[in-house]
C-alpha cells in the first residue's frame, strides 16, 4: 500500500555515526559527556557521539534514500552547520534552540527531505562563529 504522501517518513531509520567518512576535526567519543556545563537527557550522555568543537570541521556521509539529517544534542555551544547534498551549493542550519543555553536537548534536524530515491552524498561542515559545538548521536535517513 502506497502512503498518501510520497515523502512521508514511513521508511525512516537511524544510521550509525561511524558511517561518516573524511572526518576533519570530528571524532567519535564512545562515552560522551559535555565539556560545557549543561543538563542532559538519558540516551544522550554516556553514549557514542560524533563530536566537534571547531569551526571548519567537515565530514562526508553516503546514504541511500529520499531524506537525510542528524539526531543531535543541541547544547550551549550548538553551531551553525553548513550542508550540501550531491554537490549542491551549501545551505546553513542553526542548531541552537530556545532550550540550548542550559540543556543538551535531543533534536532531529533534516537537511533535505524530497530527494530522488537512490544514492546520495552529504557534506557537512561547521560554520565560523561564536558557537562551534556539535554532538551527533545518529544520522537519520528516510529510504
Question: Model-found features: residue ranges?
Answer:
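Conserved catalytic region of serine esterases and O-acyltransferases that act on ester linkages
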Residues: 1-143
Amino acid at each position: 500500500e502506497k502512503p498518501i504522501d510520497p515523502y512521508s517518513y514511513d521508511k525512516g531509520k537511524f544510521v550509525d555515526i561511524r558511517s561518516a567518512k573524511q572526518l576533519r576535526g570530528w571524532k567519535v567519543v564512545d562515552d560522551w559527556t559535555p565539556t560545557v556545563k549543561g543538563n542532559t537527557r538519558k540516551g544522550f550522555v554516556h553514549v557514542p557521539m560524533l563530536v566537534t568543537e571547531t569551526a571548519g570541521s567537515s565530514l562526508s556521509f553516503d546514504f541511500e534514500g529520499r531524506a537525510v539529517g542528524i539526531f543531535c544534542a543541541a547544547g550551549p555551544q550548538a553551531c551553525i552547520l553548513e550542508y550540501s547534498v550531491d554537490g549542491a551549493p551549501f545551505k546553513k542550519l542553526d542548531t541552537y534552540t530556545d532550550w540550548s543555553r542550559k540543556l543538551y536537548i535531543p533534536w532531529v534536524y533534516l537537511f533535505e527531505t524530497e530527494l530522488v530515491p537512490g544514492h546520495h552524498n552529504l557534506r557537512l561542515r561547521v560554520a565560523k562563529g561564536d558557537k562551534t559545538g556539535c554532538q551527533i548521536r545518529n544520522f537519520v535517513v528516510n529510504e
